Amino acid sequence: RGGGFIGIGEPTAFEHEGAFFQLSDVLGVQKENGFTLNNTREIPEPASGHFVAVDMKEDIDLGLPQYSVFLCGLEARALLIRNRSVSVAVNSFGRGRAVYLSGLPYGPSQARLLRRALFWCSGKEKDFLPWTAEDPRVECHYYPSAGHLAVTNNADENVETTVFFSDGRVQQFSLSPLALVWMEV
C-alpha cells in the first residue's frame, strides 16, 4: 500500500529468529548482535545528494551512537556512517519509504533532518520548500485560514535568512535572538 515509516534508535527491536530489528525489510537496516560468527559486513560509501541529507552536516549530533547497524535490502542507502555503523539510512519498500536515524536529540539541525525525513517518507519532496527558511535555526509556521506567517529564530544570536513562499517569492529576514515575527500573507 505504501506509506512512510521513521525509525529512531532501535526501532522494532526484539531478538527473534536471528533478527534484531523486526521491520528490517522496511527500514533497510539490521543490527548485528554477535550471532553470525565473524561474518564481516561491507561498509558502504554514504550516498550523496539525497533529499533527506541536503541540510545535514557531517558532524550532526544524533545522540548516543548505535553500533553494528548495517544495510540490508537492495533499495537501502546509507546517508551517514559513523564508527563503521549506519547512522542515517533511507529505504524504499513496495510503494512505501522509510528512514532510519540512530538517534535524534532536539536541535535545529535535527529538526530540519526530521522535517526532511517526513516529507520524503510521504513522497512530498516538492512541497518542502514553501514556508521554509534557508537557515535551519529559523522555523516558519503558516496559518492559511488566518493568512498569517510566523517566522521564529530559535538561535540565541542574530540570524539573517531567506524565507521561501508558496507563490515562488522569497523574502530576507534579519532576526534578533529568539525573535518571533508575524506577517500577513
Predicted segments — roles?
Residues R1-V185:
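A conserved amphipathic helix/loop scaffold
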